[in-house]
Amino acid sequence: MADLTAWRALVDKELAGAPFDKLVQRTAEGLAIEPLYVEAPARATRPIGAASFRVCMRARPGEAAEHIDGGADALWLDGDDRDGITLAAKRDVLVVVDRFSTERFVPFEVEPRVVWLGFDPLASGLQLGPKIEQFWQAVSRAMPPFATGEMRNIRVSTLPYHAAGADAADELAIALSTAVAYLRAMNGAASQLWFQISVGRDTFGELCKLRALRVLAAKLFAASSIAAAIPPIHAVTSSRTQAARDPWVNLLRVTTEVFAAAIGGADLVTPLAFDTELAEPSALGRRVARNTALVLRDESYLGRVIDAAGGSYYIESRTDALAREAWQRFRAIERDGGIAKLIASGALQARLDASWATRAAAVAKRNEPVLGVSEFANLDEHLPSAPSGAAHGHRDAEAFEALRAKYASRDVVLVSLGTPAESRARIGFAKALFATAGVRAREAETGQIVCLCGSDDNYAAHAASVAAQLRAAGATKIALAGKPNGTAGVDTYVYVGCDVIVALEELLA
């Protein structure tokens, strides 16, 4: 294309010799995000005529009526909440039921048309380890009573893998391998499958993940000569993105995640309450979460648009790239013996640990910011000192929240080198950085824990001598706000791109 060639020539001119790849971003999966997408759109990946999504609320015993009366048309219940199940059946509300045991599975009488059973032994096995074999035995005993009707009984959930650190491609690969394991283990499983998947912070990446899941499920069924319809998708906003600090920001996180789920083509969407990490979700938290999804569906009309992202070459290209990467990873899992073998051997957990370590490093360096926690921390909020532990697995905010719980009482002094104009920018930077640990840094001439703030020229001329004077005055730890420069007497450096967790642990411990 002539226009594209001309554009590339202008870009190369502006880059002045720098590589074009400087403009190409990389996802956590290593996939390229190009700076410009101009080709003709690809075919949409969501079936034409797909229905609107249901708002599916996670309900504790006694909360079913609250959610139904508030507008929810699906409930996610524990199997023990038989009153909630009965109520939902009477009102034509779809019910997702978590109900299984390592020893036995207890069926219950209810209208088949309203229930999806959350029977997913492999996902549970990630947490239960050796007990996974008991789950396999439970599957064969439990399935016969539910082999007919419109119920869906076999859940393929990536929630525990997402919480453990899986990236999007791994989530999809694990979902496919889990589905294959169930298809092999149980006759007629194809019509009983449904997917449950987390939706995280990357709006475009996450909606592409849901679209890719449909593409991959269709490819898997075609390769297996299965004529069943593609399993429906239950999207759940991510527990990994929830923060205990400045929890009001979770309202915005959940909003973008519900949006991604809706545009990605989810059949059910569960929004988590903004205060999930503080304690059991409050009535306000539950109401706001429910209304967030209802507003997006009914007032913003996301539920009335068929495949809103279809036709965008950017979306279609990212979906295709993610699907291809996930398919390759799925094949690798199968070559290694399948998902059950990887779980039992601990290989999958090791893989997820490595993935989480990469993500945690990006969060620690604030390349992946957590607003209200690693950026723009609120020093005046008064919340429980530790999260409730409601979510299993990891959360993006966990390391910074732990830092704040340990060191919020520390006294940090900022010592200015040079004029106010020369030191103002780095003083502001240092105050914001120490706030992530709950520390209200103050400007003074000396203290036990000190951070030098000034210009590079002033550092070169005065930092070493000032550090020596501070040591003589009783300073035990000295930091410098700037890139490492070998200044004598400085213990650590804080700067944009540094590992904030490591730097503050060294300084505040």
Task: Name what the model sees in each region.
Residues 182, 194-375, 476-484, 492-508:
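Active-site capping/gating regions of soluble enzymes
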